Each structure stands twice: as structure tokens, then as C-alpha cells.
């Protein structure tokens, strides 16, 4: 599934709820899901990692949609490697 297709499915599925919650409320839900992903990673919970990554992606798609951001366009910044140095793998000095 392409990012734009995924974003469209999420938009059609949750548009009404996301609109009622607004950008701030939807962003807070996404942050909660990031916390759940952090817990699954910290506990090395193989069974739950994929589930939580999917939840984070879905909430990111919701935030992007109600903020007017196209995920395909946003991801295209990385289409040719590192957006700073242009290399694959990144050749930037560590930060």
C-alpha cells in the first residue's frame, strides 16, 4: 500500500472523529500511541511492536490529513536519500 492510499483510507475511515477532535486532540492521541510504541520497544515485545507501529502510522496519517499535509509529498523529501547531504547512506556528521 502506498502512503497516499493509506492516508486516504484513514481519512475516509476517521474523518468525522478527527475533525471533531481537531489537530491538537488528534496530535495528543498520536503522542499517546508513540508512548505505547516506546513501551513495546523497551520491553522487546515482538508481538506488539508491529501493532503499535501501525497505530502510530494511522494517527500520523490522521494528523497530516487534518493539518492539510499530503504524506506522499512530505515523504518525497527523502526520495533521493538524506535531504541534507543527498547521500545514501547519510554522510552527514553525527549530531
Model-derived regions, located:
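Flexible "arm" and connector segments at domain edges
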Residues: 1-53, 57-95
Amino acid at each position: 500500500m502506498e502512503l497516499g492510499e493509506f492516508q486516504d483510507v484513514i481519512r475516509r475511515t476517521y474523518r468525522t472523529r478527527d475533525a471533531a477532535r481537531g489537530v491538537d486532540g488528534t496530535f495528543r492521541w498520536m503522542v499517546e500511541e508513540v508512548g505505547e510504541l516506546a513501551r513495546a520497544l523497551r520491553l522487546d515485545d515482538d508481538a506488539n511492536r508491529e501493532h503499535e507501529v501501525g497505530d502510530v502510522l494511522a494517527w500520523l496519517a490522521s494528523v497530516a490529513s487534518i493539518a492539510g499535509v499530503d504524506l506522499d509529498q512530505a515523504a518525497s523529501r527523502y526520495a533521493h536519500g538524506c535531504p541534507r547531504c543527498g547521500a545514501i547512506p547519510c554522510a552527514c556528521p553525527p549530531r
